Design a protein with these regions (language model features):
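Glycine-centered flexibility sites
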Residues: 21, 35, 80-81, 103
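Acidic, metal-coordinating catalytic segment for phosphate/diphosphate chemistry
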Residues: 13-51, 56-57
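Extreme N-terminal tail/first-helix region
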Residues: 1-19
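Conserved Nudix-box catalytic region and its N-terminal flanking loop in Nudix hydrolases
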Residues: 6, 44-46, 51-96
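Active-site segment of metal-dependent pyrophosphate-handling enzymes
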Residues: 24, 47, 57-58, 68-69, ...
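Residue-level signal for pocket-adjacent positions within structured domains
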Residues: 12, 38-39, 71-73, 77-78, ...
Length: 123
């Protein structure tokens, strides 16, 4: 059996370009395992975040409609938000966000998964 090769990238240089409460941008120069270099690789750092898939008693999904400037449109999306420091857990954050954004609360809650939004560039 072949031994797995090291696939990690080597960070040659790293600098923060912008640091805001909801978003931080870092630029790195990296070297790939094959020796190739990428002089500007951008990484976006976010605080811990939750998304809620809410289903009503009538088996209907709950979405919110919000203007999103990045897209330039009002879009339907899952209820989502940042885990606040005062929240005891991501579950508490999810419950708070759902109530704030939709008025829905209570019900049965379960964690489905923990995933990265876009693991290639987001932390």
């Amino acid at each position: 059996m072949e031994t797995p090769k090291n696939r990690n990238w080597k960070v040659l240089k790293s600098e923060y370009l912008s640091s805001q409460p909801w978003f931080t941008v870092r630029r790195e120069e990296v070297e790939l395992p094959n020796g190739n270099r990428i002089p500007e690789y951008f990484i976006f750092e976010y605080p811990e975040w939750i998304n809620v898939i809410a289903i009503t008693k009538e088996q209907k999904f709950v979405f919110v409609s919000q203007y999103r400037h990045g897209l330039g449109i009002t879009a339907y999306e899952l209820c989502a938000g940042v885990c606040e420091k005062e929240d005891a857990s991501p579950l508490v954050s999810a419950q708070r966000e759902l109530l704030e954004e939709t008025g829905y609360g209570n019900g049965n809650w379960s964690e489905l998964m923990v995933i990265g939004v876009n693991p290639s560039t987001h932390t």
